[in-house]
Amino acid sequence: MARIAGVNIPDNKHTVISLTYIYGVGRTTAQKICADAGVNPAAKIKDLSDEQIETLRGEVAKFTTEGDLRRDVNMKIKRLMDLGCYRGLRHRKGLPVRGQRTKTNARTRKGPRKPIRK
Protein backbone atom coordinates (compact mmCIF):
# COMPACT_ATOMS: atom_id res chain seq x y z
CA MET A 1 0.00 0.00 0.00
CA ALA A 2 1.29 3.41 -0.96
CA ARG A 3 1.14 6.13 1.68
CA ILE A 4 0.06 9.59 0.51
CA ALA A 5 -0.79 12.46 2.90
CA GLY A 6 -0.62 10.08 5.87
CA VAL A 7 -3.23 7.72 4.41
CA ASN A 8 -2.71 4.18 3.17
CA ILE A 9 -3.93 4.14 -0.43
CA PRO A 10 -5.29 0.79 -1.76
CA ASP A 11 -3.01 -0.72 -4.42
CA ASN A 12 -5.55 -2.67 -6.44
CA LYS A 13 -7.82 0.25 -7.38
CA HIS A 14 -7.57 2.91 -10.07
CA THR A 15 -5.54 5.98 -9.18
CA VAL A 16 -8.56 8.32 -9.18
CA ILE A 17 -10.54 6.05 -6.86
CA SER A 18 -7.57 5.46 -4.56
CA LEU A 19 -6.93 9.18 -4.12
CA THR A 20 -10.49 9.69 -2.88
CA TYR A 21 -9.55 7.75 0.28
CA ILE A 22 -7.81 10.97 1.39
CA TYR A 23 -10.09 13.30 3.38
CA GLY A 24 -10.66 16.40 1.27
CA VAL A 25 -10.01 14.76 -2.11
CA GLY A 26 -13.09 13.87 -4.17
CA ARG A 27 -13.41 12.56 -7.72
CA THR A 28 -12.93 15.96 -9.41
CA THR A 29 -9.90 16.87 -7.31
CA ALA A 30 -8.42 13.40 -7.85
CA GLN A 31 -8.77 13.77 -11.63
CA LYS A 32 -7.13 17.20 -11.45
CA ILE A 33 -4.25 15.77 -9.38
CA CYS A 34 -3.71 12.95 -11.90
CA ALA A 35 -3.73 15.39 -14.82
CA ASP A 36 -1.25 17.75 -13.13
CA ALA A 37 1.03 14.86 -12.16
CA GLY A 38 0.85 13.33 -15.64
CA VAL A 39 -0.42 10.01 -14.30
CA ASN A 40 -3.01 7.86 -16.10
CA PRO A 41 -6.16 7.97 -13.93
CA ALA A 42 -7.12 4.44 -15.02
CA ALA A 43 -3.76 2.97 -13.93
CA LYS A 44 -3.69 1.03 -10.70
CA ILE A 45 -1.50 2.27 -7.86
CA LYS A 46 0.56 -0.94 -7.80
CA ASP A 47 1.53 -0.36 -11.46
CA LEU A 48 2.87 3.17 -10.82
CA SER A 49 6.58 3.80 -10.37
CA ASP A 50 8.03 5.37 -7.22
CA GLU A 51 8.64 8.60 -9.15
CA GLN A 52 4.97 8.82 -10.17
CA ILE A 53 3.86 8.23 -6.58
CA GLU A 54 6.22 11.00 -5.45
CA THR A 55 4.71 13.40 -8.01
CA LEU A 56 1.23 12.44 -6.74
CA ARG A 57 2.39 13.21 -3.18
CA GLY A 58 3.62 16.61 -4.34
CA GLU A 59 0.33 17.40 -6.09
CA VAL A 60 -1.76 16.30 -3.09
CA ALA A 61 0.39 18.47 -0.82
CA LYS A 62 -0.78 21.56 -2.77
CA PHE A 63 -4.33 21.01 -1.45
CA THR A 64 -5.59 21.32 2.11
CA THR A 65 -6.29 17.74 3.18
CA GLU A 66 -6.65 15.44 6.18
CA GLY A 67 -5.78 16.99 9.56
CA ASP A 68 -5.40 20.58 8.32
CA LEU A 69 -8.79 20.50 6.59
CA ARG A 70 -10.50 18.92 9.62
CA ARG A 71 -8.95 21.59 11.84
CA ASP A 72 -10.09 24.39 9.50
CA VAL A 73 -13.67 23.08 9.42
CA ASN A 74 -13.79 22.71 13.21
CA MET A 75 -12.33 26.20 13.71
CA LYS A 76 -14.97 27.71 11.41
CA ILE A 77 -17.76 25.95 13.31
CA LYS A 78 -16.23 27.04 16.64
CA ARG A 79 -16.06 30.64 15.35
CA LEU A 80 -19.78 30.55 14.50
CA MET A 81 -20.56 29.22 17.96
CA ASP A 82 -18.45 31.92 19.65
CA LEU A 83 -20.15 34.65 17.63
CA GLY A 84 -23.53 33.47 18.88
CA CYS A 85 -25.11 33.79 15.45
CA TYR A 86 -28.08 31.65 14.39
CA ARG A 87 -25.93 29.03 12.68
CA GLY A 88 -23.66 28.85 15.73
CA LEU A 89 -26.63 28.34 18.05
CA ARG A 90 -27.95 25.54 15.83
CA HIS A 91 -24.53 23.85 15.94
CA ARG A 92 -24.41 24.25 19.71
CA LYS A 93 -27.90 22.74 20.16
CA GLY A 94 -27.19 19.90 17.74
CA LEU A 95 -30.03 20.84 15.39
CA PRO A 96 -30.05 21.15 11.57
CA VAL A 97 -28.19 24.29 10.49
CA ARG A 98 -29.47 24.86 6.96
CA GLY A 99 -33.16 25.49 7.50
CA GLN A 100 -34.54 21.96 7.46
CA ARG A 101 -37.74 21.20 9.35
CA THR A 102 -37.45 19.76 12.84
CA LYS A 103 -41.06 18.97 13.82
CA THR A 104 -40.65 15.66 12.02
CA ASN A 105 -37.47 14.13 10.62
CA ALA A 106 -34.04 15.56 11.58
CA ARG A 107 -33.40 12.38 13.59
CA THR A 108 -29.83 12.05 12.35
CA ARG A 109 -28.88 15.45 13.70
CA LYS A 110 -31.01 15.33 16.87
CA GLY A 111 -30.11 11.76 17.85
CA PRO A 112 -32.45 9.07 19.12
CA ARG A 113 -35.81 10.03 20.64
CA LYS A 114 -35.82 10.86 24.32
CA PRO A 115 -38.80 9.73 26.41
CA ILE A 116 -41.09 12.44 27.78
CA ARG A 117 -40.54 12.94 31.51
CA LYS A 118 -43.46 13.62 33.82
From Swiss-Prot:
It comes from the Bacteria. InterPro entries: Rbsml_uS13_C (IPR027437), Ribosomal_uS13 (IPR001892), Ribosomal_uS13-like_H2TH (IPR010979), Ribosomal_uS13_bac-type (IPR019980), Ribosomal_uS13_CS (IPR018269). GO terms for cellular component: cytosol; small ribosomal subunit. Pfam families: Ribosomal_S13. GO terms for biological process: translation. The keyword GTP-binding does not apply. Disulfide bonds: none annotated. GO terms for molecular function: rRNA binding; structural constituent of ribosome; tRNA binding. Residues 92-118 are annotated as: Disordered. Keywords: Ribonucleoprotein, Ribosomal protein, RNA-binding, rRNA-binding, tRNA-binding. Part of the 30S ribosomal subunit. Forms a loose heterodimer with protein S19. Forms two bridges to the 50S subunit in the 70S ribosome. Belongs to the universal ribosomal protein uS13 family. Located at the top of the head of the 30S subunit, it contacts several helices of the 16S rRNA. In the 70S ribosome it contacts the 23S rRNA (bridge B1a) and protein L5 of the 50S subunit (bridge B1b), connecting the 2 subunits; these bridges are implicated in subunit movement. Contacts the tRNAs in the A and P-sites. This is Small ribosomal subunit protein uS13. The lineage of its organism: Bacteria, Pseudomonadati, Pseudomonadota, Gammaproteobacteria, Pseudomonadales.
